[in-house]
A protein has these predicted regions:
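Active-site beta-strand-loop-beta-strand hairpin of nuclease catalytic cores
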Residues: 492-510
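Residue-level detector of functional hotspots within protein domains
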Residues: 455, 476, 489
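A short acidic/basic microdomain associated with nuclease active sites
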Residues: 462-483
Length: 519
């Protein structure tokens, strides 16, 4: 309730403070009320609660927010220096710096922090974009790349152009670093808000927040180990399904890419198994415009895209970087090789919709369409595409319940008539997580979600029956004047033991805040 200023009165909260102060303090932490410093509720509580424990609590909240101010100043200053860049130009510079992650001495980024930073920078840019940034045609595309990308990767560019681009890259590096620092510190605030082991204090020379025990950390690590074991389980099932299908005895694609293509097929089968058995999806996906596409083709396209970007972009770039030791030179050689072979090997790729469909079509071969299906390819492109103009409008309107897609969740980005991709995302993204979050986070309001959840409940019920349980699915206790218990997903009984199960089938969460909301 504390997310909304008009959901509860300050008087009621003050009454709660007098009887259960710890409960109210946890409610403030869970709701992050203290981040809304101008909230009438927050101001009323601060004015009325003057006891020592409350003053320490308010002081800790202030200290946590004060730490964000230097980062916000750096971010604001860097954005001001870069505001003359169009959306396309900013993305071009981001794509250059993104390749630093593929250097041999680059630190591991297992949590995807780099993508979080780039995602936030792009979303903030989308909130400030003029409409003309989305009216992209061939002329404007060429002019922008000539002024802002060519001088970086081709050394024969003029000195003035190169100096201007170097200055833009330097300011963007400042923006990236400051945004990274802010996101890191937001993790500390989430720790304070959602970790039941987190305690706080205001003592000179001591940390403001600390853990009473390591139970929360150990629980998080244990969950990670479970996730790793489940990954191996589903991959093992997919390998067996791949062998049973007869594909293991066939050449897939060119001989040099055969092993990578095999792995792509196995991963697609793994994802299909999980989506069907855990998330209740069928063999075909219905899109919002009524078109349908095979789920396997949707998943296979993303896996083969990763193979393509890894083999044609990342590996050659790393070879060139080892030779020259200079990021720009390596990117220039990669781009030049592409031009000599008639291919786009720039740090980001783009083409019009028909060209994208033509390339994807070959991945939709089936008995029904032995040469592939253009309609299926178009549906796949639609499924994986984020329309940045529409997203900009959504962000400006601040529509509740409409989450913005993350970079990897919809890795085709529509600007004007062009579809863009980032090889530095596509080559290393987790395509299963991308598919799940596309379906269950970005498109959580799909009409099919309820039917999918019912399939999960029925499949789980059947599995339990095979193990000797008596199972009732979807039981609704009678509604009384005093109470409405709602639906009980599964009631299971065996050997005198009764289990009441609530089936939850959401998206893949990556932060303590998201996990807490799920619970």
């Amino acid at each position: 309730m504390l997310h909304f200023d008009n959901a509860v009165s300050a008087e009621l909260l003050l009454e709660l403070a007098s009887h259960a102060p710890d409960t109210l303090r946890w409610a403030i932490r869970y709701s992050k009320l203290f981040e809304r410093t101008a909230s009438p509720l927050w101001l009323a509580l601060r004015a009325a609660l003057v006891g020592g424990e409350w003053q320490v609590f308010f002081g800790v909240c202030d200290r946590l927010l004060d730490q964000l101010k230097p980062f916000d100043e750096l971010i604001g200053n860097a954005e001001k220096q870069l505001e003359h860049l169009s959306l396309l130009e900013l993305i071009a510079y981001l794509s250059v710096l993104a390749y630093q992650a593929f250097a041999e001495d680059a630190p591991d980024d297992r949590s995807g922090q780099q993508w979080q930073v780039y995602n936030r920078i792009i979303l903030r840019k989308l909130r400030a974009c003029p409409e003309q940034d989305f009216r992209l045609n061939e002329s404007r595309l060429g002019q922008s790349l000539k002024r802002h990308l060519s001088p970086v990767i081709f050394p024969e560019s003029s000195t003035a152009d190169a100096a201007r681009c170097r200055e833009n890259l330097e300011w963007l590096a400042v923006l990236i670093a400051a945004t990274q620092e802010r996101i890191d510190y937001e993790g500390s605030i989430d720790w304070f808000c959602f970790d039941p082991e987190c305690r706080y204090q205001l003592k000179p020379g001591e940390l403001v927040i600390y853990n009473q025990s390591e139970a929360g950390t150990e629980r998080w690590q244990r969950t990670g180990r479970k996730s790793d074991l489940l990954w191996h389980y589903w991959m093992s099932r997919a390998v067996q399904a791949f062998v049973n299908s007869g594909l293991a005895e066939q050449m897939i694609g060119s001989p040099e890419n055969h092993e990578l293509n095999q792995l792509a097929y196995i991963k697609a089968m793994r994802s299909e198994l999980q989506l069907q058995q855990i998330y209740g999806l069928g063999h075909r996906r219905s899109l919002s415009n009524g078109t349908q596409v095979q789920l396997h083709h949707v998943l296979l396209a993303s896996e083969l895209t990763s193979v393509f970007f890894q083999s044609q972009f990342i590996q050659p770039f790393q070879d060139y970087l080892r030779e020259s030791g200079v990021l720009a030179h390596a990117l220039g050689r990669l781009a030049m090789d592409g031009m000599l072979s008639g291919e786009n090997r720039f740090p980001m790729t783009w083409s019009e919709e028909e060209e994208k469909i033509r390339r994807i079509k070959g991945w939709t071969v089936s008995e029904e369409h032995p040469r592939g299906s253009a309609d299926s390819a178009k549906a796949i492109l639609r499924f994986w595409t984020s329309d940045l103009s529409a997203l900009s409008q959504q962000l400006l309107k601040q529509q509740p319940g409409m989450p913005a897609p993350r970079l990897y969740e919809q890795p085709f980005y529509k600007i004007g008539r062009y579809s863009f991709q980032f090889p530095w995302v596509g080559a290393q993204q987790n395509n299963l997580t991308a598919a799940i979050n596309n379906l269950r986070r970005v498109n959580a309001r799909r009409a099919d979600v309820q039917a999918e959840t019912q399939r999960v409940e029925l499949a789980l019920a059947e599995s339990l029956r095979q193990r000797g349980f008596a199972v009732e699915v979807g039981y609704r206790p009678p509604v009384t004047e005093e109470d409405d218990a709602g639906e009980v997903d599964l009631i299971c009984q065996r050997d005198g033991v009764l289990l009441l199960m609530e089936v939850k089938s959401g998206y893949i969460r990556s932060t303590t805040h998201e996990v807490w909301l799920h619970r």
